[in-house]
A protein has these predicted regions:
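Nucleotide-activated chemistry modules centered on ATP-dependent adenylation/adenylyltransferase
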Residues: 1-200
Length: 200
């Protein structure tokens, strides 16, 4: 199942730039698409939705179970004993599976080619380091959307000096290459199948 659009097309169509609080791309291209398919094709009493939450993501399960009701939701990596990503990688090595490339490069999630509007500075720094052409392509799209909307919006936030303001990917790149301090302490968590309260 596929919508046929990429995240940037969704942002242009909805006239809104996804960010750490509102992930239109995940909502439209993942959650709503799957939800519509489940509604059409699956009996709730005979269908279980399996999610790949690991032991570090247990807090996401309650929201996910509420969102995906009336289907039963399971996250096998949270079941006894819970497994975190290191446990999963160890198990993969034991059975001869190769570690997903993005994990091997330090990304916390192996999705969307390392790009995620819900991610933080840490993930974007990794994207710039390992895939600079991909980072630059997203920076161009962000700038195009800013012009299209006529607004000072950005995926990231600058929290320096106690003030919060938009931090474009172009400016983030400049700061990263100048070795200026970035906010790389909050991780780069994914929430694709765990909806947050949205304002868009």
């Amino acid at each position: 199942m596929a919508d046929g659009r990429d995240p940037w097309q969704v942002f242009f169509d909805r006239r809104f730039l996804g960010n750490t609080r509102v992930d239109l791309c995940s909502r439209i291209l993942k959650r709503e698409l799957l939800r519509d398919w489940l509604d059409r094709e699956c009996e709730p009493g005979a269908t279980t939705v399996y999610l790949g939450f690991d032991g570090d993501e247990a807090a996401r399960m309650a929201r996910a179970a509420t969102y995906w009701a009336p289907w039963t939701v399971r996250a096998p990596l949270l079941e006894d004993p819970p497994m975190d990503k290191d446990d999963v990688r160890d198990l993969m090595r034991m059975v001869g599976l190769k570690e997903p490339r993005l994990y091997a490069l330090g990304f916390k999630h192996n999705n969307c080619g390392g790009f995620c509007v819900k991610a933080g500075h840490e993930q974007f720094q990794l994207l710039l380091k390992h895939f600079p052409e991909r980072f630059d392509a997203h920076a161009r799209r962000e700038q195009e959307l800013r012009v299209f909307l006529g607004k000072d919006v950005a995926i990231l936030r600058d929290r320096r000096g106690g003030r919060m303001r938009p931090l474009t990917l172009v400016e983030f790149r400049r700061r990263a290459l100048a070795n200026e301090q970035l906010d790389c302490f909050g991780g780069s968590d994914c929430a694709c199948f765990t909806p947050e309260p949205e304002t868009a």
